[in-house]
């Protein structure tokens, strides 16, 4: 019999989708049975108390978690999020319920043996509940107590060769897509870039010194499988400078129905005959494509790299050969100033190891943001407050048309002194020689 009645949570198990409630109940039953005979280092009933406190929150319409100060491991300023329940007598199993963030490998490649060892640590020293993965990309280990933190950290670092992730006002754990290891559209090695910058900026990751969090995300192509354009302060997205490659015969094969569009995805129902006009040409956001009945043409200078045509006809269209990445800045979720998408800063960078060109931009941004950013102000909010123009100045990047968001509406142009010949100072005598009273 369950420790707590949870009628509201039970409803969440009734839908067609997998339920986190079922997962927690399964873990509660496993811990109660204890088939491995473990000497649990945290209360055996912590998953049941977790359900109980959540049911109470549903009943009362308010949270019963509090942020009870700073907990962590020696020498690190991040990686552990301290959480305490404000009803410890009712739910002693979750009186302390700290979260441990564990750095994921580039591309999130794991061996079964590694995952088994990780879960063995967490079964013994935590609740057994995990989240694979958090929105930053970390492995999230949900629920342990303060005395176990150093023990967990020791086992992760000494036995699994794994580090903690980032939390607090620091660099969060960089995240990348699968990149060149699996994807035919990869324009640069996103996994290598992610690893290189992770190792380069260990201090920034573990010792908070920023106004607020800062996230790197690396997408190897414009499909954006880690959504860097929407979820990271510094987004590196693969792109190409030359033309999309067209296989004219393969285009005709798609039109004739010989090849399935979208590489066979969405084939669970009959969508009718493939219509290249409706499904490709008319869906191009910049209207840079034309089909004359026998030939597909692309005005590449108008292409915005949306990837729709390439995804729809991958055997006929392919990314160009002059490949690299674009750098965008300022994306974030709606905390203080509303959600923001990334703004293009560097239209094209070669993105080759050791990625020094990317590091130069990063460090100039940090120098400015750490000086000018307010407490708990993301980079995107600093950009909005002090202007994108200021960001261009501090990064020493020349303005280009791609930086323009929209035509300006202010008729006044404000020049800087260095932009005016002779500056602000004028010799009145010389002026009167040219302009009589």
Curated annotation (Swiss-Prot):
Residue ranges of domain 4Fe-4S ferredoxin-type in the record: 294-322
Molecular function GO labels: 4 iron, 4 sulfur cluster binding; dissimilatory sulfite reductase (NADH) activity; heme binding; metal ion binding; sulfite reductase (ferredoxin) activity; sulfite reductase activity
Any Gene Ontology biological process: sulfate assimilation
Chain sites annotated for binding [4Fe-4S] cluster 1: 177, 183, 221, 225
GO terms for cellular component: sulfite reductase complex (NADPH)
UniProt entry keywords in alphabetical sequence: 4Fe-4S, Iron, Iron-sulfur, Metal-binding
Pfam families assigned to the protein according to its UniProt record, in alphabetical order: NIR_SIR (PF01077)
Binding site for [4Fe-4S] cluster 2: 284, 303, 306, 309
Source species, domain of life: Bacteria
Subunit structure: Heterohexamer of two alpha, two beta and two gamma subunits.
Function: Part of the complex that catalyzes the reduction of sulfite to sulfide. The alpha and beta subunits may have arisen by gene duplication. They both bind 2 iron-sulfur clusters, but the alpha subunit seems to be catalytically inactive, due to substitutions along the putative substrate access channel, and because it binds sirohydrochlorin (the dematallated form of siroheme) instead of siroheme.
The protein's name in its UniProt record: Sulfite reductase, dissimilatory-type subunit alpha
Taxonomic source organism: Nitratidesulfovibrio vulgaris (strain ATCC 29579 / DSM 644 / CCUG 34227 / NCIMB 8303 / VKM B-1760 / Hildenborough) (Desulfovibrio vulgaris)
Gene: dsvA
């Amino acid at each position: 019999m369950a420790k707590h009645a949870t009628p509201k949570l039970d409803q969440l198990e009734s839908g067609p989708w997998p339920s986190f409630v079922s997962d927690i109940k399964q873990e509660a039953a496993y811990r109660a049975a204890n088939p491995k005979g473990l000497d649990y280092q945290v209360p055996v009933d912590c998953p049941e108390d977790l359900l109980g406190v959540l049911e109470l929150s549903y009943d009362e319409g308010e949270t019963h978690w509090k942020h009870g100060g700073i907990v962590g491991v020696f020498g690190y300023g991040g990686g552990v999020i301290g959480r305490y329940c404000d009803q410890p007598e009712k739910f002693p199993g979750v009186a302390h319920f700290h979260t441990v963030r564990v750095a994921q490998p580039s591309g999130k490649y794991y061996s079964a043996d590694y995952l088994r060892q990780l879960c063995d640590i967490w079964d013994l020293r935590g609740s057994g509940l995990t989240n694979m993965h958090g929105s930053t990309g970390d492995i999230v280990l949900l629920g342990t107590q303060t005395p176990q933190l150093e023990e967990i950290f020791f086992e992760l670092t000494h036995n699994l060769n794994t580090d903690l992730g980032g939390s607090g006002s620091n660099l969060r754990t960089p995240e990348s897509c699968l990149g060149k290891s699996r994807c035919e559209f990869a324009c640069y090695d996103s996994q290598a870039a992610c690893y290189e910058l992770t190792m380069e900026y260990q201090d920034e990751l573990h010792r908070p010194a920023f106004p607020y969090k800062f996230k790197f995300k690396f997408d190897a192509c414009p499909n954006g499988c880690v959504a860097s354009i929407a979820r990271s302060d510094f987004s590196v997205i693969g792109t190409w400078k030359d033309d999309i490659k067209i296989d004219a015969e393969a285009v005709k094969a798609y039109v004739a129905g010989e090849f399935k569009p979208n590489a066979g995805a969405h084939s669970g129902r009959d969508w009718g005959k493939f219509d290249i006009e409706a499904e490709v040409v008319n869906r191009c956001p910049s209207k840079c494509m034309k089909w004359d009945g026998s030939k597909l043409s692309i005005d590449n200078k108008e292409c915005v790299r949306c990837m729709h045509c390439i995804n729809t006809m991958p055997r006929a269209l392919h990314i160009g050969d002059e490949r690299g990445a674009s750098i965008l800045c300022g994306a974030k979720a709606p905390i203080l100033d509303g959600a923001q998408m990334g703004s293009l800063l560097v239209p094209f960078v070669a993105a080759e190891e050791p990625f020094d060109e990317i590091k130069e931009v990063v460090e100039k941004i940090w120098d400015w943001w750490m000086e000018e950013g307010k407490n708990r102000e993301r980079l995107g909010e600093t950009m909005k407050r002090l202007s994108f123009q200021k960001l261009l100045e501090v990064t020493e990047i020349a303005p280009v048309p791609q930086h323009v968001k929209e035509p300006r509406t202010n008729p006044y142009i404000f020049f800087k002194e260095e932009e005016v010949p002779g500056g602000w100072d004028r010799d009145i005598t010389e002026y009167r020689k040219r302009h009589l009273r």
